[in-house]
């Protein structure tokens, strides 16, 4: 008798097996692992999740946070600061065109916060309920065509919250090739939730079709990048091994604690750099440096991309935070639908922010971080410019 047979004999001797009727969640959990009805349920889950994030986010933005910022907070801070600080650079940095307490509150609280909060509400629920691992199993064949295993889907989805934890989460990959590919895919084509919130706000004045096209473009770039990298990077991708927990309702206390922790990290890791970038924008505007930089970048910004000259601030601030490549576009009057889509495309594909560059350097090396940053920047300008030029050619 070999070791395995001996182990089975001992287990059978000491284990008591009782037949019980599976609960509804047990039956649903098992069904979600099969192509039918698993794939329709998975697609419905994704659609409902996006509906909650975008629909409820727009409601919070329009009826609660928008009035709170525009009618209460901004007038309050303007009154206080105007009374305390006299006209000058400091006054303009605080409540001017790019003021911390004017445009800063609008971008952070009204344009981005509702979508970030709802993303983490939905993602944490999918994570704690056991739905995410089942999605990984169902989409394993699709993920393998991208050169990674299905289990990597969870890590990539995490990138829609923030690229930093997604890159750190790539440590779970079983090969170096897969880990590098996951990190590159997140940097090239996955918008963080702050950037997604800014894009939703940008396209709200035009058509929801633009947002759909943007995500289709993101997916297309993701497939192309993964296909190219799978041929360039040497190595293999191991078969998927993933633990499938029971399908259950999340524990309320643990769920709330996780949600609070993620929002705390968002405010510390995202909003502080965003405030810094707003200060930089205000200083560039007040000192006249913005106009000087715009002169040198005008052939790219206005000529190739077809964007207004003032959009140069988006390219500068996007280096600090990805959503800041979108936020300045919200303030440009007379922006056309094509310009909004081109600007959104460049922002979507633009180089990783400073925090992502830092984590890439730490997890891999500085050479890899520089290579990804240069490649994403060139890709963003190339794709954005091609869309603009082709649109003018056929329109």
Language-model features: where?
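Short, non-transmembrane cytosolic segments of multipass membrane proteins
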Residues: 1-11, 137-148, 223-236
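Switch/coupling subdomain of P-loop NTPase systems
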Residues: 1-29
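Interfacial helix-loop-helix hairpins and adjacent transmembrane helices
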Residues: 6-16, 232-263
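Alpha-helical transmembrane segments and their helix-start/interface "positive-inside/aromatic belt" motifs
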Residues: 29-45, 264-274, 364-372
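Generic alpha-helical transmembrane segments of integral inner-membrane proteins
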Residues: 40-48, 117, 121, 216, ...
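Transmembrane helical segments that form the transport core of multi-pass membrane transport proteins
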Residues: 41-109, 119-125, 129, 135, ...
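Membrane-interfacial helix-loop connectors
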Residues: 106-108, 122-181, 185-193, 199-209, ...
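Juxtamembrane and boundary regions of transmembrane helices in multi-pass small-molecule transporters
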Residues: 165, 170-178, 188-190, 197-246, ...
């Amino acid at each position: 008798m070999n070791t395995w047979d001996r182990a089975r004999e001992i287990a059978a001797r000491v284990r008591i097996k009782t037949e019980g009727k599976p609960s509804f969640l047990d039956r649903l959990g098992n069904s979600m692992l099969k192509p039918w009805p698993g794939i329709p349920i998975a697609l419905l889950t994704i659609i409902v999740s996006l509906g909650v994030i975008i629909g409820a986010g727009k409601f919070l933005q329009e009826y609660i946070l928008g009035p709170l910022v525009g009618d209460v907070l901004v007038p309050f801070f303007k009154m206080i600061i105007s009374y305390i600080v006299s006209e000058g650079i400091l006054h303009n940095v605080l409540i001017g065109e790019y003021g911390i307490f004017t445009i800063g509150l609008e971008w952070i609280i009204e344009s981005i916060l509702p979508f970030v909060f709802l993303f983490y509400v939905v993602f944490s629920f999918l994570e704690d309920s056991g739905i995410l691992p089942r999605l990984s199993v169902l989409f394993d064949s699709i993920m393998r065509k991208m050169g990674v295993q299905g289990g990597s889907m969870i890590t990539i989805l995490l990138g829609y919250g923030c690229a930093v934890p997604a890159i750190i989460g790539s440590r779970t990959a079983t090969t170096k090739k897969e880990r590098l590919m996951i990190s590159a895919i997140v940097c090239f084509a996955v918008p963080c939730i702050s950037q997604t919130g800014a894009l939703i706000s940008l396209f709200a004045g035009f058509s929801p079709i633009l947002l759909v096209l943007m995500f289709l473009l993101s997916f297309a770039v993701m497939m192309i990048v993964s296909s190219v990298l799978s041929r360039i990077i040497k190595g293999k991708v191991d078969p998927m091994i993933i633990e499938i927990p029971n399908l259950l309702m999340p524990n309320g206390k643990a769920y709330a604690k996780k949600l609070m922790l993620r929002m705390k990290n968002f405010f510390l890791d995202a909003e502080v750099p965003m405030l810094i970038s707003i200060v930089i924008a205000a200083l560039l505007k007040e000192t006249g440096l913005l106009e000087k930089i715009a002169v040198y970048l005008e052939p790219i910004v206005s000529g190739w991309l077809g964007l207004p000259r003032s959009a140069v601030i988006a390219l500068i601030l996007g280096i600090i935070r990805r959503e800041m490549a979108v936020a300045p576009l919200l303030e440009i009057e007379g922006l056309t639908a094509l310009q909004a889509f081109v600007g959104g495309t460049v922002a979507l594909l633009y180089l990783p922010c400073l925090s992502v560059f830092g984590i890439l350097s730490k997890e891999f090396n500085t050479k890899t971080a520089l290579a990804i940053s240069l490649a994403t920047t060139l890709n963003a300008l190339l794709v954005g410019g091609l869309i603009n030029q082709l649109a003018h050619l056929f329109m």
